[in-house]
UniProtKB/Swiss-Prot annotation:
Entry-linked Pfam families: OTCace, OTCace_N
Outcome recorded upon mutating residue 126 to G: In OTCD; early onset; loss of ornithine carbamoyltransferase activity; 0.9% of wild-type activity
Organism: Homo sapiens (Human)
Top-level taxonomy: Eukaryota, Metazoa, Chordata, Craniata, Vertebrata
Effect of residue 40 to C: In OTCD; late onset
Effect caused by changing residue 220 to A: In OTCD; late onset
Name used for this protein in its record: Ornithine transcarbamylase, mitochondrial
Length: 354
């Protein structure tokens, strides 16, 4: 038993429309887990080993089981505050973070560009130091990865990447949890990316091989992934004995793939490129024709919001589509990230197979 639990109330307490057993618990020394992430930043998954990423997924599954399935109330973040800086609007990132942090007993504080202008009204250095004195962690959704790097350098509290131009690590954690739930294991899966060489693809490239997953990615000419990311992904594939295929042919990328993945073709800040991008991405829509060359057990992922030109309704709303469980898992994975960076908690649930 990893924790000493003492039941304070035998009756269910009604909280937020759910019945929770209110328990008092203390975090003892982990008996099974050797991974310690407390105090770390989460800027990119390239900074984390396979075991560390697996630990965050394990913790995600644990919190989901204890809170959603068992109805427990776990105030692991009671008395803690989270600063949320959003230069880009969001549905899933904001809602999952705010509800998740509050569900764990903490207080999230949302700041938009009207409240805080990174590096404009106040330097990034000063902002980082002020936030460090008032919050326990910061989740920032920004245009430039370099801004996150500066915040992390100057802050004395964990900085979490809620999205940048280069990476979107918390989305990939949700994707992997969804796939683990569906396939029971990640090792040996082939991920087929069809779309832009963007922050989602970059985050997959920084992590898939660490799970023993293969990656086949198709992007239009001129929209390939970042060269430095590609170089590191090739190194990871070599170290882990996995396949990495980068092509401009969507059907080649989809061939034999277990998981078909795409994303928006036009990210926020690229609106002026819309006409050019729509032309460049002709032939990249995921359809049943794409699925015909995939593995017999194929599934589909999209981080949302989705446009019909990216994936047709037949695939998007099919029983093979995991997009809505994927969206829900944004909540459980960001909760796990915050718990792992801010507490000594270790999962009670048996470690899943990865």
């Amino acid at each position: 038993m990893l924790f000493n639990l003492r039941i304070l109330l035998n009756n269910a307490a009604f909280r937020n429309g759910h019945n929770f057993m209110v328990r008092n618990f203390r975090c003892g020394q982990p008996l099974q887990n050797k991974v310690q992430l407390k105090g770390r930043d989460l800027l990119t998954l390239k900074n984390f080993t396979g075991e560390e990423i697996k630990y965050m997924l394990w913790l995600s599954a644990d919190l989901k089981f204890r809170i959603k399935q068992k109805g427990e109330y776990l105030p692991l973040l009671q008395g803690k505050s989270l600063g949320m800086i959003f230069e880009k609007r969001s549905t899933r990132t904001r809602l999952s973070t705010e509800t998740g942090f509050a569900l764990l007993g903490g207080h999230p504080c949302f700041l938009t560009t009207q409240d805080i202008h990174l590096g404009v009204n106040e330097s990034l250095t000063d902002t980082a130091r002020v936030l460090s004195s008032m919050a326990d962690a910061v989740l920032a959704r920004v245009y430039k990865q370099s801004d996150l790097d500066t915040l992390a350098k100057e802050a004395s509290i964990p900085i979490i990447n809620g999205l940048s131009d280069l990476y979107h690590p918390i989305q990939i954690l949700a994707d992997y949890l969804t796939l683990q739930e569906h396939y029971s294991s990640l090792k040996g899966l082939t991920l087929s990316w069809i779309g832009d060489g963007n922050n989602i693809l970059h985050s997959i490239m920084m992590s898939a091989a660490k799970f023993g997953m293969h990656l086949q990615a198709a992007t239009p000419k001129g929209y390939e992934p970042d060269a430095s990311v590609t170089k590191l992904a090739e190194q990871y594939a070599k170290e882990n004995g996995t396949k990495l295929l980068l092509t401009n042919d969507p059907l080649e990328a989809a061939h034999g793939g277990n998981v078909l993945i795409t994303d928006t073709w036009i990210s926020m800040g690229q609106e002026e490129e819309k006409k050019k991008r729509l032309q460049a991405f002709q032939g990249y829509q995921v359809t049943m024709k794409t699925a015909k060359v995939a593995a017999s057990d194929w599934t589909f992922l999209h981080c949302l919001p989705r446009k019909p030109e990216e994936v047709d309704d037949e695939v998007f709303y099919s029983p093979r589509s995991l997009v809505f469980p994927e969206a829900e898992n944004r909540k459980w994975t960001i909760m796990a990230v915050m718990v792992s960076l801010l507490t000594d908690y270790s999962p009670q649930l048996q470690k899943p197979k990865f």
